[in-house]
Design a protein with these regions (language model features):
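Catalytic active-site module of serine/aspartate enzymes centered on a nucleophile-bearing elbow/loop
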Residues: 240-273
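Gly/Ala-rich beta-loop-alpha elbow adjacent to hydrolase catalytic centers
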Residues: 100, 104, 108
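N-terminal cap/lid segment of alpha/beta-hydrolase-fold proteins
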Residues: 1-14
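Flexible "cap/lid" loop of the alpha/beta hydrolase fold
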Residues: 113, 121-151
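Active-site loop/oxyanion-hole signature of alpha/beta-hydrolase fold enzymes
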Residues: 45, 49, 58-99
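Conserved alpha/beta-hydrolase catalytic His-Asp/Glu region
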Residues: 133-138, 153-211
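Conserved HGGG/HGGXW glycine-rich cap/lid loop of the alpha/beta-hydrolase fold
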Residues: 16-67
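Conserved loop-alpha-helix segment in the C-terminal half of the alpha/beta-hydrolase fold
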Residues: 48, 215-248, 254
Length: 273
């Protein structure tokens, strides 16, 4: 994995990041933005080795996730977007291709919206314009807000391991990583996870997604049970994105890591051309 470091940002705090600077000083920078309840490593471990050969790579653990910033403030996607740009300032990075996975998609899009000149292009993976357009979705979020805090308190390492075991086929190269994945998931702050879910439930980029105006690619997971493929296609249409469709569920990065890596590499290449 790329080397890790703590980046201190005035008025914000200390952030755990991975940053690998390419030997080519002119190599573009790719910022990897992870999903809800994940962290940079468990979302992007399959792609690190390939990306560092061609790009400088920045990976950030968002607030309350993994080794991310702990704060008493209510979780906001906008704060996460601003965090990444503030980290870029400290590292002397002028612009990035923002690769957003699931929740990382909204964070990447908000970076582009709020910091126009800092995002060269977007790669949006297994994500959507919104998650609450239907009554059923809104009901599920409401139930989740009530149940989630209790569920997280009762979740044991054994239950997490059982969940991961059920999601990763034995044939996957990631199957042997189960103990590590469990330990990484346990780093998350349960209060922040609940807050982040609430923030996602309120996110709606439909009024402004078409105005971003940057090269965009959308990696659509065609068997996704968490973010419906039709929602992913709606995002791609709104952002005029090049679509790369792959045969996988929401955790395709664990289930088919080689397929996921190939799609990410292809998507970045297309938006950088």
């Amino acid at each position: 994995m790329p080397n890790s470091r703590i980046v201190s940002v005035p008025q914000r705090g200390e952030f755990f990041v991975r940053y690998a600077k390419n030997e080519n000083a002119n190599a573009p920078v790719v910022a990897l933005l992870h999903g809800w309840t994940g962290n940079a490593d468990i979302n992007f471990f399959p792609v690190y080795a390939e990306l560092v050969q061609h790009y400088s790579v920045l990976a950030v653990d968002h607030r309350g996730h993994g080794r991310g910033l702990r704060t008493n403030d209510r979780f906001a996607l906008e704060d996460c977007a601003d965090d990444v740009v503030a980290i870029m300032d400290q590292l002397g990075i002028s612009s990035v291709t923002a690769v957003g996975y699931s929740m990382g998609g909204p964070i990447a899009m908000l970076m582009s919206k709020r910091h126009t000149n800092r995002v060269h292009s977007l790669v949006l993976c297994a994500t959507a314009l919104e998650w609450s357009a239907t009554r059923g979705e809104r009901t599920r979020w409401k139930i989740g807000r009530v149940v989630s805090p209790v569920f997280r308190l009762l979740t044991t390492p054994r239950l997490i391991d059982r969940y991961i075991k059920g999601k990763i086929p034995r044939a996957s190269s990631a199957a042997t990583l189960r103990p590590w994945l469990v330990s990484e998931i346990r780093r998350n702050d349960s209060w922040t996870m609940n807050q982040a879910g609430r923030a996602l439930s309120k996110y709606d980029a439909r009024p402004w997604a078409a105005t971003l105006g940057v090269p965009t690619a959308s990696i659509v997971t065609s068997r996704d049970s968490l973010v419906a493929p039709n929602k992913q296609h709606a995002l791609a249409q709104a952002t005029q994105a090049t679509v790369i469709e792959i045969d996988g569920d929401h955790l395709v990065n664990w289930q088919k890591p080689e397929l996921f890596t190939a799609a990410v590499v292809d998507a970045i290449r297309q938006v950088r051309e």
